[in-house]
Structures are given as C-alpha cells and as structure tokens.
C-alpha cells in the first residue's frame, strides 16, 4: 500500500513540475519577442535570466525524479521471449527494491509434458507418463553479466519425483566475440545437445536421438567447469568457436552420478573444442565439428583416454528442417588391452504445413563390445515416424511410431504420444 501511495505522490509531483516547466516555457515564448522589439533594460534581462535558471532547475528535478523511480519493465512478445530462452541470451530488467537499491529481476519460464507410451517389448507396460517439469530462469546482473538456471523435476524409476539442477551458469559477455561462463552446463558436443535442452516443447520429435539421450547415450550431457564461446571475425562465413574445460565424467563407481558436481575423482580435466559456420549465403545452414577429451580411471580396469569427435550439418529454414550428425567415441586404454570405437549417427527431416509438422528420423549406433560404457547399446538402428501439431503458440501435441532393430535381440515397435507446453 505504501508503495502505491509513494508511486502516486511521485507521479503527482512529476505532473506538477512538468506543468510548471510548460507554463514557464510558454511565458518565455510570449515575452521574448516583445522584449526583443525594444531595447531591453537591466530589469528585463535579469527577469529573463531568472526564468531561464528556473526552467533549468525544474528540468533537473524532473531528471532526478525519473532516475529515482523504477523504470518500466519491458514485456516482450511471448513467442520471442521463449525462442530466446532456449538460446540462453534472455536478459531481465531491474526494479527498485523497498530499501531504495536496485535488484535484478528473474525472467521465468516453465516447460512441461505429459504423454502415453506402449510397445511390444515383453518387459514394458503401457503407461501414461508425466515427463520433465522444467523451471528455466535468467537474470541480468549488469549489462554484460547474467545468471542462467535450469531446474528439472522428474519422476524416477521408483515413481518418486527427484529434483536436479541441470544447468547453473554465471555468464559474462562483453561483446559478440567473447562469452565466458562458469558453472554446470550442457557440453557443446555436436548440435543437438546445445540446441535442445530440457524443454520438450522446443523439440520436433518426442524422443531425443539415442546418442544424445540424457542417460545411456554416447556423449557426456553435462559438465562442471568453465567455457568460452563467441564469434570469429570471418566476414560472411559466420564462424563461431567454443572451448570448455571441466571435471569430466565419473568412472570409478558406476553407481555414482556421472556428472561430478562437487568433487572430481582425479586431478585430470576434460576439455572440448568446437567450431561452427553459419554462412550468410545459405541462411539456416550450420556446419560444425567438435572434439572432446577425457581421461577415465575406472576401478580395477585400465586407465582410458576417451576421445569423442562429433560433426554436424543442419538446415533450419522457415518450413524445412534437416538435421544430420555423427559421433565417434574412441577409447584408448593405457595397458595391453584393445582400443575400442563406438559410432552413432542420425538424420532427421521435417516440414511445416500450417500447424502440422510431419517428421522422419533414422538412427544407427554400433557400440563396441569391448567398451563397458556402451556395450549394452550393441548394434541398433531403425526409423522413427511422427507428427507434431502446434496448438497455438504455447502447446503442441505429438504422435510417434518407432521401430528398433537390435543385434541378436527381438525388434521392438513402440507408439508414443505427448502433449508438450510452456507457461
């Protein structure tokens, strides 16, 4: 209530000062020509000087009042706000705190999904499911410093909800050529892992490509550390770089969380280097590659240098989307043990027809039996067919059929439906 009264008093005061400035200005405009027609005396000159000083004083008071009041908050269009949220460059405004200081304001988005899944795999049951509930927040601390947080609520294998801080970043971006971040981030391996995070509403398909799965995929999804990214002066080629260094993945105990949030199990650090191009001549096209290196020290096993190389070529136009990626993981053991290579790839194409977007994906993974981290994947491949229908700007319903062929195992056919939304 007191805030409302103070705000009303400030508004009335600004109105009174503005009225005084206007009346004084009108008086000056009327008086000045008359004074110019005759030889001005000392008294007239003194009167004009005082009036000018009064106007300047009133203008100064108006400026001080405006600075002391909270600036109006910008309300961007919902669609533009959401699209920038996934690119991690949304910045919030500031407001005046009750104590008179300026406090940052968080820009908040929620993403969620519910669905149904059925398959002919013997161990599966048809089930309604509640997917991830994603709380995405950003806040500007200064013009170049911001915080990003992504907290996900999801059901575990025991049907109990667990809460994970999927991303927590403090980012400094003084210019388009440098952005430095520290905290927990999605590794920039390939395209999909940084283009699509934990909000299913952004994704065309219901499921992620297997090699980018949150659990059981080919790449480390998260890491804790420092990264730098930005543009490379390259004219119309549109080059961008990224460099990351972090704790890497846990390997000593399979029961532990893979992402080493609080302590690294060894002194070695993982690093990732990537380069991509967005040529102006081909709008919507991006090609790039990345190399990730980590040293794993599993218990009762040989030390392993794991190198992950990823390459992608994607096109995202107004209607047409075509994603192509390949990932190769080479595990070199520092002992008389054979090295292993695991490869995964996928292609996904879709096209918008009004509110409808049919899509097709084909994926292939050939995991080495000598690699304990991936051997359960084996050889698997198959197509995915689906249809997405946008229900306005903030919700989409999806239906998907997937056929999965596995080496020495029965083929699995599955049907999945999903309602994804943001609010």
Q: Across the structure, where does each feature detected by a protein language model lie?
A:
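N-terminal periplasmic/intermembrane-space "pro-region" immediately following the signal or transit peptide
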Residues: 2, 34-119, 423
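Residue-identity detector for glycine
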Residues: 8-10, 25, 93
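Bacterial N-terminal signal peptides
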Residues: 20-31
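Outer membrane beta-barrel
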Residues: 95-251, 267-272, 276-286, 348-359, ...
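Active-site-proximal beta-alpha loop/turn segments in soluble metabolic enzymes
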Residues: 244-262, 294-298
């Amino acid at each position: 209530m007191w805030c409302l009264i103070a705000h009303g008093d400030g508004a009335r005061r600004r109105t009174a000062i503005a009225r005084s400035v206007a009346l004084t200005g009108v008086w000056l405009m009327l008086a000045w020509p008359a004074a110019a027609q005759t030889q001005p005396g000392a008294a007239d000159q003194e009167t004009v000087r005082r009036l000018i000083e009064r106007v300047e004083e009133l203008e100064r008071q108006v400026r001080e009042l405006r600075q002391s009041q909270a600036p109006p908050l910008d309300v961007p269009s919902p669609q533009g706000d959401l699209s920038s949220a996934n690119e991690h460059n949304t910045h919030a405004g500031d407001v005046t705190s009750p104590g008179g200081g300026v406090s940052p304001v968080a820009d908040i988005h929620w993403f969620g999904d519910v669905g149904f899944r059925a398959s002919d795999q013997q161990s599966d049951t048809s089930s309604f499911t509640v997917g991830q509930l994603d709380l995405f927040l950003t806040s500007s601390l200064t013009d170049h410093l911001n915080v990003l947080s992504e907290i996900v609520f999801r059901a575990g294998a025991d049907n109990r909800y667990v809460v994970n801080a999927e991303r927590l970043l403090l980012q400094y971006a003084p210019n388009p050529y440098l952005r430095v971040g520290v905290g927990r981030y999605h590794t920039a391996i390939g395209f999909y892992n940084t283009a699509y995070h934990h909000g299913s509403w952004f994704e065309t398909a219901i499921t992620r490509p297997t090699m980018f799965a949150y659990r059981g995929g080919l790449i480390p999804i998260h890491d804790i550390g420092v990264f730098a990214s930005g543009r490379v002066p390259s004219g119309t080629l549109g080059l961008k770089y990224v460099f990351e260094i972090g704790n890497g993945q846990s390997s000593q105990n399979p029961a532990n969380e893979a992402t080493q949030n609080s302590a690294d199990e060894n002194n070695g650090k993982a690093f990732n280097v990537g380069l991509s191009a967005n040529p102006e001549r081909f709008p919507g096209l991006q090609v790039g590659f990345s190399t990730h290196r980590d040293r794993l020290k599993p218990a009762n096993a040989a030390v392993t240098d794991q190198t992950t190389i990823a390459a992608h070529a994607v096109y995202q136009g107004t209607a047409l989307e075509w994603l192509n990626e390949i990932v190769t993981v080479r595990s070199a053991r520092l002992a008389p043990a054979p090295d292993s290579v695991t490869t995964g790839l996928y292609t996904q194409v879709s096209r918008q027809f009004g509110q409808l977007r049919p899509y097709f994906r084909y994926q292939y993974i050939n995991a080495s039996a000598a690699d304990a981290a991936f051997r359960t994947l084996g050889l698997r491949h198959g197509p995915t067919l689906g249809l997405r229908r946008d229900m306005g700007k903030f919700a989409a319903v999806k239906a998907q059929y997937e056929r999965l062929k596995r080496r020495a195992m029965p083929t699995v056919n599955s049907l999945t439906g999903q309602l994804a939304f943001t609010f």
